From Swiss-Prot:
This is Cytochrome b. Belongs to the cytochrome b family. GO terms for molecular function: metal ion binding; ubiquinol-cytochrome-c reductase activity. The cytochrome bc1 complex contains 11 subunits: 3 respiratory subunits (MT-CYB, CYC1 and UQCRFS1), 2 core proteins (UQCRC1 and UQCRC2) and 6 low-molecular weight proteins (UQCRH/QCR6, UQCRB/QCR7, UQCRQ/QCR8, UQCR10/QCR9, UQCR11/QCR10 and a cleavage product of UQCRFS1). This cytochrome bc1 complex then forms a dimer. GO terms for biological process: mitochondrial electron transport, ubiquinol to cytochrome c. It is found in: Mitochondrion inner membrane. It comes from Herpestes ichneumon. GO terms for cellular component: mitochondrial inner membrane; respiratory chain complex III. The gene is MT-CYB. The lineage of its organism: Eukaryota, Metazoa, Chordata, Craniata, Vertebrata. A ubiquinone binds at H201. SUPFAM superfamilies: a domain/subunit of cytochrome bc1 complex (Ubiquinol-cytochrome c reductase), Transmembrane di-heme cytochromes. The chain crosses the membrane at residues 33-53, 77-98, 113-133, 178-198, 226-246, 288-308, 320-340, 347-367. Heme 1 (or BL or b562) is low-potential and absorbs at about 562 nm, and heme 2 (or BH or b566) is high-potential and absorbs at about 566 nm.
């Protein structure tokens, strides 16, 4: 009799994806983040489901319903903070995952990479809409400012913004539809993640050396299941430490003030994980130019495979490209810092220089360093 694990139509899929999957023998901890993202997604869907049972998407009661969850619902405060800080964990894992892909040349798997970019956009949209739901000051003004960016689109901009708002300002209709979208998008993300995995398993995983590992594969279980569980435990300890000791560390105090359309907060800023893109947006004094730069700061990932000039896949043996990669990481951290600062000297010029450097590294310096390294190998 055949093993049910290998014969049953449904269990067979799980088996081929998580148990008998041939994996490279040398993948490092940087390959843990895919599974961590899966866990983050499940955690967000579950906590979100329980929050949705008590939340009301009405401008009059949204803020009060969140307060009610924190005060009166059994462990409601914990579910709420798991959801809010779980989003931060999600983005930390996302940035690490994308960074790993850039460093080790995983972007040469074009289908997997492009679905990944689509996933990144969808997760960002979901997080933005989720931030609007508590209906605090930063929720309201964040929604107003970010949706207003679409008015920069020539000819249809203003109509588009009013269509998204469902009126002439961010109001009840906006909150209701944002809640509906925020609820449905994680399930779309789940489907996209399954497709992402499907395309990955067509080619097999990349590995740190960047060369084919077909001659040296090991089964995913138990080697990488145990490794993933270790990564998971570390992440959960970090998340629970954040929730139980400093749950509001990454939030904005302004969001504990109910939304008031008549009172603008002094510094409107998004959650920390959007600050790098927000800094790029603000560094261009023209509205349409800023919006284009904002979109391109993420869309640029789609052309990274086309800019790959090196004969080697990853950066493991490419010191020049390594320097540029870590310069890019430092630059993104600088942009994140600038995005949270007021628009005044010297922050304006720092933001503009960091934005120029960001695009220069990816579009100009990386391809040049790849070509130089090819020449160095010939010598």
């Amino acid at each position: 009799m055949t093993n049910i694990r290998k014969s049953h139509p449904l269990i067979k899929i799980v088996n081929e994806s998580f148990i008998d999957l041939p994996a490279p023998s040398n993948i490092s901890a940087w390959w843990n983040f895919g599974s961590l993202l899966g866990v983050c997604l499940i955690l967000q869907i579950l906590t979100g489901l329980f929050l949705a049972m008590h939340y009301t998407s009405d401008t009059a009661t949204a803020f009060s319903s969140v307060t009610h969850i924190c005060r009166d619902v059994n462990y409601g405060w914990m579910i709420r903070y798991m959801h809010a800080n779980g989003a931060s964990m999600f983005f930390i894992c996302l940035f690490m995952h994308v960074g790993r892909g850039l460093y080790y040349g995983s972007y040469t798997f074009m289908e997997t990479w492009n679905i990944g970019i689509l996933l990144l956009f969808t997760v960002m949209a979901t997080a933005f809409m989720g931030y609007v739901l508590p209906w605090g000051q930063m929720s309201f003004w964040g929604a107003t400012v970010i949706t207003n960016l679409l008015s920069a689109i020539p000819y249809i901009g203003t109509n588009l913004v009013e269509w998204i708002w469902g009126g002439f300002s961010v109001d009840k209709a906006t909150l209701t539809r944002f809640f509906a979208f925020h609820f449905i998008l994680p399930f779309i993300i789940s489907a996209l993640a399954a497709v992402h995995l499907l395309f990955l398993h067509e080619t097999g995983s990349n590995n740190p050396s960047g060369i084919s590992s077909d001659s040296d594969k090991i089964p995913f279980h138990p080697y990488y299941t145990i490794k993933d569980i270790l990564g998971l435990l570390i992440m959960l300890v970090a998340l629970m430490t954040l929730i139980l000791f400093s749950p509001d560390l990454l939030g904005d105090p302004d969001n504990y003030t109910p939304a008031n359309p008549l009172n603008t907060p002094p510094h409107i800023k998004p959650e920390w994980y959007f600050l790098f893109a927000y800094a790029i947006l603000r560094s261009i004094p023209n509205k349409l130019g800023g919006v284009l730069a904002l979109v391109l700061s993420i869309m640029i990932l789609a052309i990274v495979p086309l800019l790959h000039t090196s004969n080697q896949r990853g950066m493991m043996f490419r010191p020049l490209s390594q320097c540029l990669f870590w310069l890019l990481v430092a630059d993104l951290l600088t942009l994140t810092w600038i995005g949270g600062q007021p628009v005044e000297h010297p922050f304006i010029i720092i933001g503009q220089l960091a934005s120029i450097l960001y695009f220069s590294i990816i579009l100009i310096l990386m391809p040049i360093s790849g070509t130089i390294e090819n020449q160095l190998l010939k010598w």
